[in-house]
Every structure is written in C-alpha cells, then in structure tokens.
Design a protein with these regions (language model features):
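Active-site nucleotide/adenylate-binding loops and adjacent lid/helix of ATP-dependent enzymes
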Residues: 2-8, 38, 82-85, 125-206
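Conserved N-proximal alpha/beta basic substrate-recognition cap immediately N-terminal to
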Residues: 32-146
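Glycine-rich phosphate/pyrophosphate-binding loop regions near the starts of catalytic domains
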Residues: 208-217
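Glycine-rich, phosphate-binding/catalytic loops in enzymes
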Residues: 23-25, 105-108, 183
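Short glycine-rich anion-binding loops that position phosphate/pyrophosphate groups of nucleotides
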Residues: 10-13, 94-96, 170-172, 212-213
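Short, solvent-exposed beta-strand-terminating loops
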Residues: 2-29
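Short hydrophobic-acidic sequence motifs that mark active-site Asp/Glu residues
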Residues: 89, 166, 216-218
Length: 218
C-alpha cells in the first residue's frame, strides 16, 4: 500500500493592502488563507507563508515517496487531517497568531497520533520566542549577547545596555520587523524604533547588544 503523505502548508495571500480608511476585515473562520485580515498592521504579516510555486515544488519532491495530500493549515485543518488520515505529515506551515504559532500544526498532529516532520511544538515555540530562547542559552552556559525585553517605550528609555543596540520583534521570524533602523546607535533612535515595533507588531521587542560574548561581530 502506498504511503499517504499529508503536506501541511500556509499559502501566501495575493491581494493589495487596503487603502487609508478602509474597513478592517475580521479574522477568517472560513478555512481559506485567501481571507486576509488587516487588524494587525505589520506590512509583512504573511511574509513567512509560501508561494504556490514553492508548495508545488515540495509536492513534486514528495510524490516519489507516496500519495501527497495537500492540507492547508487554516481553521479547518483538524477536520481535514482527520478525513485524510495520512501516514505522515510533512510540515512547512508557519501559522499566523502568537509566539506558539509554529507549533500549532505539530501539536494537532500529536493530539491525533499522526507522525510529522521537523521539530516538536515545544522546540518550535521556544525558538520563536527569542527572549525565552536566550534565557535557555544562558541557563545552559551557552554564550549569547546581552539583551532586554522592552514591553513599553519606557523600557527602552530606561535600557541600561551600552550602545549600539539591535531592536526587533520578540516573536517573529524570517526577518520580519528587521530593517536598517533596527540598529540603534543612540537612545533616541532606540526609543523611536521600539515605539514603532510595539505599535506595529503588538508584541514585546527584543533589544540586544551587537557584540557577542567575547566575540566581535564583523
């Protein structure tokens, strides 16, 4: 009997951003990633999701191993997984909401007893939560750059770390929220960038030294 492989993915939406004053879309409950939401203002909200060509390429690579069943990782994923009953899930889904989003699909697979590729929910969640990941490194004695977590603009104003500093969203990946303005050489720049990131991404901001422990970055 051929192996049944579930391909879990997020398909990047293709739609223009709303014009100024446009009404805000509600979160989708229809099970389609094409239902965009604009209540989160970050310009790169769907940056981690994959283009159709990428998903097609992954499916082609998996076909020699068995039957491939596409399982888009949206609201009805649990129902689709139960119906498809794959032997294994090849997971490239990123999720959308919260610091645990990359662990949602593996957690559902575990709950339903379906083996899956890559890391488990705990590993994915810890890795995406940058301050927690750095705390784990510190606990285990692994060198990591000094850092602080800014939850408010006041935290940035009171930051005691020496400049220059690097500021980025604490729960993002794929370079989301990172730009030339992330490197802050003065407190004024840091406060401005932290204020922007807090209002845009609505999550804490990781502020870290640009020097590693005992190592100069070049």
């Amino acid at each position: 009997m051929a192996v049944r492989i579930g391909l879990a993915f997020n398909l990047r939406p293709e739609a223009p951003a709303p014009s100024a004053g446009a009404s805000i879309a509600s979160p989708s409950v229809s099970g389609s990633s094409r239902d965009l939401r604009y209540d989160l203002p970050q310009p790169d909200l769907y940056a981690e999701w994959d283009e159709p060509a990428t998903i097609d390429a992954v499916e082609r690579a998996l076909r020699p191993l068995g039957e491939v069943i596409r399982l888009e990782a949206v609201a009805d994923f649990p129902a689709k997984l139960a119906k498809a009953r794959p032997d294994f899930v090849f997971n490239i889904a990123e999720g959308l909401y919260g610091p645990n989003r990359e662990g949602h699909i593996p957690a559902i697979c575990e709950f339903m007893g379906v083996p899956y590729s890559a890391s488990d929910p705990l590993t994915l969640s810890l890795a995406l939560h940058k301050s927690r990941a750095k705390e784990m490194l510190q606990l285990r004695g692994v060198p990591t750059a000094p850092f602080m977590l800014a939850r408010t603009v006041a935290d940035a104003r009171n930051c005691a770390l020496p400049f220059p500093l690097f500021a980025k969203p604490a729960f993002e990946g794929s370079g989301k929220g990172v730009s030339v303005k992330s490197l802050c050489t003065t407190r004024k720049e840091l406060v401005k960038q932290v204020d922007y990131l807090l209002s845009t991404y609505r999550e804490p901001v990781l502020v870290s030294s640009t020097d590693g422990v005992g190592t100069k970055l070049k």
